Amino acid sequence: MAKLTKKMKAIKAGVDSTKAYEINEAIAVLKQFATAKFVESVDVAVNLGIDPRKSDQNVRGATVLPHGTGREVRVAVFTQGANADAAKEAGADLVGMEDLAEQIKKGEMNFDVVIASPDAMRVVGQLGQVLGPRGLMPNPKVGTVTPNVAEAVKNAKSGQIRYRNDKNGIIHTTIGKANFSEVQLKENLQALLVALNKAKPTTAKGIFIKKVSISTTMGAGVAVDQASL
């Protein structure tokens, strides 16, 4: 068994794994142990009361966090004509059609999000084996296949996050950075939970949001008392 580092021992001693912390206290605990040489991300895990084996109970979507994620997002857009001009004006980093597809086929993938107008999906569809495994394939369910590409670019640039439950029915995503204020992190988390509640499948029974835990990149998870949200 691997030995615990000093930091891991300190975290283990300082975090009560049996306790659900009031949100401000939870954030304070995270910040206390966010001592890496880089600004750590603050991540959240939300356990949902769904049966992920049933396709009609899977949860997937996107929402814009009020305070963003703290990271710069590079956006590639597949579109043409007036939409291409609008995408560039909105801040897209890469805009094109077949020319952009050729870049991607060559392995040039310097972007974090791919957006496409519906008429461009004939081109994007050829890139499924490249974009799919990386979670980059545009999808209308998360707003990345849309006729309004300019709005989608603005959303991506302003802190939109995409979420999707894993095989255990858990949502994993980022709600900011460790240098965000307690208020910013709390409001970002609240925005995510509001979006998840709106996305609750009609077939899901019982308690929908069962557990919420937050953590930093190098830190331990801290359970959050939902009543404090």
From Swiss-Prot:
Q: Which UniProt keywords apply?
A: Repressor, Ribonucleoprotein, Ribosomal protein, RNA-binding, rRNA-binding, Translation regulation, tRNA-binding
Family annotation (InterPro entries): Ribosom_uL1_bac-type, Ribosomal_uL1, Ribosomal_uL1-like, Ribosomal_uL1/biogenesis, Ribosomal_uL1_3-a/b-sand, Ribosomal_uL1_CS
GO MF terms listed in the record are: rRNA binding; structural constituent of ribosome; tRNA binding
* rRNA processing listed as a keyword: no
Q: Which GO terms describe its cellular component?
A: cytosolic large ribosomal subunit
What is the superkingdom listed in this entry's lineage?
A: Bacteria
Q: Transferase as a keyword?
A: no
Q: Name one GO biological process term.
A: regulation of translation
Pfam families, alphabetically? Answer: Ribosomal_L1
Q: Which family does the record assign?
A: Belongs to the universal ribosomal protein uL1 family.
Functionally, this protein is described as follows:
Binds directly to 23S rRNA. The L1 stalk is quite mobile in the ribosome, and is involved in E site tRNA release. Protein L1 is also a translational repressor protein, it controls the translation of the L11 operon by binding to its mRNA.
Q: How does it assemble?
A: Part of the 50S ribosomal subunit.
> What is the name listed in the Swiss-Prot or TrEMBL entry for this protein?
Large ribosomal subunit protein uL1
Q: What is the lineage of its organism?
A: Bacteria, Pseudomonadati, Pseudomonadota, Gammaproteobacteria, Pasteurellales
